[in-house]
């Protein structure tokens, strides 16, 4: 049996399901979900370092999936990818990704191109002005590792505009 091929097929199926979930309608928070908190990025300024390690625990530089509430109605939301930019104990700090092209040119969003986190290969954008605080146990899965150059571009924006180190 070719385990490598089988694993690749399983990952492909997972990415397909997640891409469909990204386009899914809003829904209430999942049962037992402790909640995602949001804060202005400057209020969570800290040292940022690239440290991905696909070991089952989310680390800075990894893109993970979790349920994210809508700003206009926090009781509704959907599964979204987040770039992990920090951690404190079991809490992760993440920046939300979007594949909506209306984000292009918006100063609160930075383009990072496409990657394994989006099965359809769409260009993605990371929101800079809103940090999401997520419990480690609320992460649905690890999605991908953002390469060092793109992570550094995001980190430079956080340092230059929001006081991160």
Residue ranges: model-predicted function:
Residues 28-44:
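Short, basic/aromatic beta-hairpin or loop at an interaction surface
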Residues 54-55, 75:
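An N-terminal domain-cap segment
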């Amino acid at each position: 049996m070719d385990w490598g091929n089988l694993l690749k097929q399983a990952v492909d199926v997972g990415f397909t399901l997640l891409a469909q979930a990204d386009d899914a309608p809003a829904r209430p928070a999942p049962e037992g979900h402790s909640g995602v908190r949001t804060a202005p990025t400057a209020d969570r300024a800290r040292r940022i370092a690239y440290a991905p390690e696909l070991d089952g625990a989310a680390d800075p530089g990894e893109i993970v999936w979790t349920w994210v509430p809508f700003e206009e109605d926090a009781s509704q939301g959907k599964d979204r990818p987040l770039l992990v930019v920090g951690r404190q104990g079991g809490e992760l700090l993440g920046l939300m990704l979007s594949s909506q092209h209306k984000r292009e040119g918006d100063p609160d969003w930075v383009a990072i191109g496409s990657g394994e986190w989006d099965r359809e290969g769409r260009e993605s954008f990371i929101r800079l002005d809103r940090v999401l605080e997520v419990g480690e146990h609320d992460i649905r899965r690890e999605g991908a590792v953002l390469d060092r150059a793109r992570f550094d571009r995001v980190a430079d924006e956080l340092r230059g505009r929001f006081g991160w180190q």
